[in-house]
Structure formats: C-alpha cells, structure tokens
C-alpha cells in the first residue's frame, strides 16, 4: 500500500517546463545556435551537469555550455520575477490531502536547492514536504535512480510503499529503476504506448491522482 509520495518539481508542481523551453530557444536564437528544439526533450528532467554533458555531446567540446546555461537561467529568472511561479492545477489540493491523511512526502528535483526552496516558499507549499532532495546534492542525474532512492531513504520509507509523480521520460526511467511506483502526469511530453508498457501509471492531472489514492487504486 502506498504511504509515500515523491514529487518532481518542474512540470509537475510548477508549470515551468514550457517556460524553460521558451527561454532555451530564445537564448539559442539570440546566439545563432541551431537544433535546440530537437535536443531539448532529452534534457527535460536532468540536472545542471547532465544538461551540460548532453549539450557538449551534441554540439562539441567548444560549445560555450556554461555561458549558455547561465543565460537561460537569467532569462528564466527574469520571467519568474516579473510574473511569479506558475503553479499547476491541483497541487495544493493533493498536498493537503496527503498531509491530512498521513502520507510521507518528498520533493526530488533536478534543480539546485536554492532554486527549489525559493520557488516552493514563493508558492507557499514548502511546508508540505517532509524531505527535499535536489540536483546539486546527487552524483548521478535522472535517468539514474539515485535521487529517488535518496528520497526514499531520507523518509525511512520502503520502495514498495513509495510512488513518484513525474512528467519527463528521464524522471520516469529513474523511478522505474528505483523500484518504486511510477506515475506520469504528462506535461510537454506525451505518454507513449511503450512507456505504459513498462508499468508507468498515467493520469491526466493531479486531482485525478488524488482521487486514485483516496480510492486505493494506486498500488
């Protein structure tokens, strides 16, 4: 029986994946960098070092990767500072349900801790998470399972009693490799037949996840 729920952040809690995508394309266009739209899906869910590695593998060792990533982060922050962090529908309702019903909760994000804490506190949902594990606190990025295994361990939970809510293929692969129940709430990337065939459970939104948990339909 599920008693532990681990959340990804970008694309699950916050509607930030599309904004990040827009920022990456904007910076790429300003610098005459081609094919960014093609490579971006493989970077969704990765931490800074994994994203940098992916860019260097595609564009070559002379690609100004740190400058590019810093520019995308500055552009992203400018939008957030102006408009705020867009929270996904159903987030607060699901978190309140989990807290009220005694579930353990964690956030496992590929973003750095400073970014994670700032955004969670800005949305007034930091208080709902028992543990937080961030991309700058792990050695191996998603799709490696390290971040989810670390979250399960921090909560002193069991893998068979834990589920992960993700939107990215990298994150879902990490969840499956960790041996926990993998739940997808699609954002930018669609749920494929191949993905469903691996055992990933797909829900259209977070409110439907809440209903499924309430009715004990996620095992």
Residues of each region from the PLM?
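Metal-dependent phosphoesterase signature
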Residues: 56-92, 101
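Asp-based, Mg2+/Mn2+-dependent phosphohydrolase catalytic module
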Residues: 1-3, 96-99, 112-219
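Short helix-capping segments at alpha-helix termini
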Residues: 30-34, 60-63, 101, 124-128, ...
């Amino acid at each position: 029986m599920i008693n532990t729920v681990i959340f990804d952040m970008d694309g699950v809690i916050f509607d930030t994946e599309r904004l990040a995508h827009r920022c990456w394309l904007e910076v790429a266009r300003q610098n005459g960098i081609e094919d960014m739209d093609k490579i971006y899906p493989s970077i969704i869910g990765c931490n800074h070092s994994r994203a940098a590695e992916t860019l260097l593998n595609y564009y070559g060792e002379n690609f100004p990767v740190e400058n590019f990533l810093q520019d995308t982060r500055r552009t992203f922050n400018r939008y957030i500072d102006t408009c705020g962090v867009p929270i996904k529908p159903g987030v607060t309702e699901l978190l309140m349900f989990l807290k009220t019903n005694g579930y353990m909760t964690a956030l496992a994000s590929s973003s750095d801790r400073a970014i994670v804490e700032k955004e969670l506190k800005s949305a007034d949902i930091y208080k709902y998470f028992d543990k937080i594990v961030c991309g700058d606190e792990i050695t191996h990025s998603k799709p490696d399972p390290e971040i989810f295994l670390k979250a399960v361990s921090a909560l002193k939970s069991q893998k068979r009693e834990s589920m992960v809510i993700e939107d990215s293929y990298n994150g879902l692969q990490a969840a499956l490799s960790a041996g926990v129940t993998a739940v997808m709430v699609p954002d930018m990337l669609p749920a494929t037949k191949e993905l469903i065939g691996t055992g990933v459970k797909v829900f259209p939104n977070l409110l439907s996840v809440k209903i499924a948990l309430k009715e004990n339909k996620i095992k």
